Every structure is written in C-alpha cells, then in structure tokens.
Amino acid sequence: VLAAGTLGSTEILLRSRDQGLAVSDRVGKRFSANGDIIAFGYGAKSIVNSVGVGYPPRIEGLEIGASVTGQLEFRDAQNLDHELTIQEGAVPSAVAPSLPVMFLPNGRLLGALQSLVSGVYKGPFASLQTYFAVSHDTASGTFRLDGDKLALAWKDAQNEPCYARLDEALRSVVESAGGDYVKNPLAGTVMGHQPATAHPLGG
C-alpha cells in the first residue's frame, strides 16, 4: 500500500520508475482537480455572519456555527458530467483580517475600505457568503518530474467547461439572495487565473 497522498504517491511512483521500477504507463496521467471552485456572494440582503471570530472571540454575540451546514445538488440524468454540488461555508477567523484586502482588486473598493476601518464583522462583509462547489472536470492533468520537483501540466485548465457551469449556477444562487457573485479573489491575483482544488485526484 502506497499512501502518500495524491501528489506524494505519484511523485514516488515517477521517481521509482526512473530508477527502474516497472509501473503502468498511466502513472502521472488523468489528474483531476475534482472540478472544485471557491466563490463568494457579496452584499446580500441578509446578514450571514459567516466569518469566524476565533477563540477567545474577537467580537461577542456572534454565533458562526460549522463550516458547512447546507448543500445544493444539481442532478443531470442525461449527462453525469454536468452534475455539480454547491455547499455554503464559513471563513476561518485567521483569514478574517485579510478579507478586505483580497476583495480590493475585485471592484469592491468601497465596501473593502469600510471593512478595513470597521472590521469584517460589520458592513458588507457581515453578509458575505462563502461557497464551495465540486463538479466534473476532464481529468486532463499530467504530472512529470522537472529536475527534483513534481510538475503539473494542464493546458487551458482555467477553461474547463465545468467552471462555466459552476459560474452560472453560483451566480443564480447568489443573485437570488440579493448579492453579487465574486469568484475566488486569489485566483485572479496570486494564482494567475488558474483553478484551485481541495480534492486533488488521480495521476
């Protein structure tokens, strides 16, 4: 049994192959990001209080609750690849101070500045809703060894069809609550518009 995680196990197998171990020619192929996306509903009509307060709490009187308590499932009996799941989430307290800065490049300047002054537990960030979604990508990622490091190649990963379907579904959910749909702020700044995943699979 090789249990070093998706990336670690693939790296061990690729290194072993280069040292003469007979392995399948599929090792390193068909990596999937699980069609994951993180997104936000900004400025909704209702107060959400989904930003963690830490312990001891930074602010009294807010009950944040668990990270995921609700889920929407979109089924498609004709095409399973089009199925997707959306969960609501909470932002950890450690991330709270950086939230306004994350949203500055995303056209939310006024609200971000307001929360920089008054904190994320008041103003527009009090109605910020976090969404985690999973779907089906084409599993087109390929791993290889680049010198001494594992490298991933996936042409046009950001243009996978599943992300457009997720955008459409999430936008509908967010707008029905009176908010504005905001994609993962870090994807466009820190990550160069590449997708992120919490569930690396295959390879």
Predicted regions and their residues:
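Glycine-rich loop(s) and the adjacent beta-strand/alpha-helix scaffold that form part
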Residues: 2-59
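Generic, well-ordered alpha-helical scaffold segments in large soluble proteins
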Residues: 3, 15-16, 34, 136, ...
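Residues that flank catalytic or metal-binding motifs in active/ligand-binding sites
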Residues: 27, 35-36, 127-129, 201-202
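Short Gly/Pro-enriched turn/cap motifs at secondary-structure boundaries
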Residues: 28-32, 120-124, 194-197
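Alpha-helical membrane-targeting segments
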Residues: 71-132
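A glycine-rich dinucleotide-binding beta-alpha-beta segment and adjacent secondary-structure elements
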Residues: 129-132, 150-203
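Active-site beta-strand/loop architecture of penicillin-binding DD-peptidases
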Residues: 135-142
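Short acidic-glycine loop/turn motifs at beta-strand connectors
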Residues: 145-149
